[in-house]
Amino acid sequence: MRAPVSSTLLIAAGFSRQFVVNDVSGRIVCDWGGSRLRAFLETGGVIRERCSGPGIGQLEKESPAEALARVLAPWRAHWRIGRIVLCGMAGSRNGLVEVPYVRAPASLAQWRAGAGLVRSGADTLIVLAGIEAQNFRDVADVMRGEETQIFGAFALEPSLAAGRQVMVLPGTHSKWVEVRDGRIARLQTYFTGELFELLSTRSSLLRAGGTGEADEEAFEVGLRNAARFDLAANLFETRSAQLIEGRSAGWARSLLSGLLIGAEVHSMLARGEGQFGPLTLIGDPALTGRYLRALCSYGAEARQLDGELCVLAGLRAASEGLQES
């Protein structure tokens, strides 16, 4: 583990003050992404409570240290917290403390050793590293947070740590990750989630403020068209269908979702990914369900793992190993 870094910002944010009511020791683990913070209080190996807060990318008036101190204050006031372990954007340039990426190929032990350590009063904060790897076009690519889910998946399903596997982690920035014998080898990022948000809220494709219910038929149309035409040629159909055919905003959003997810999945399958057996989808079940439909529609097989269970398993694997460091 990397040497302790300055805790000045954390002390200023309130991490040096801890008034404990419950003498039972606990541990806090956090998945802090760009869009949200998910925190879990664990005692005796059991998740007791959970809470959420703003993502790193949503902070405007608070520093990351101030936001984290505010969100965790109720727990720190009632429990004796031994350590706080964080993954994701907490270790980014705009996070709590910048933790350098661990370069692939990377095993669990190598990734864990790259963690940053911050001590502040009675608190020990461990900020996990991200991964730097070549993508499938031999260009540098990075991720923060998804590696925790991958190593958690190994803990939940040990067979995934054997041989070559391809894991798909949908989200704001979707990741396709090749692992070999339990080591992260390569990764490919797709801008799909953020592109959907931008096109559906800040472009001419959808009416301002238009949402509506999801339409499964429109999603399927998007998947079919994504395999037949270029994405740039497909996109304007979301607007013309509303203007000429009277389609609802919900229908158009579902079409857009199908076009973007379909373009991502179809391009990766065209490379031959998936020919080594079922792909593994990790993430929110609703979102991975959409990717599963896309994969199946193009003739690929996949299994789903719950993203929250994987990130918790990964945070535990990192924390337990660091106790021995």
What is each PLM-predicted segment?
Residues R27-S63:
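Short glycine-rich, Thr/Ser-proximal phosphate-binding strand/loop in the N-terminal lobe
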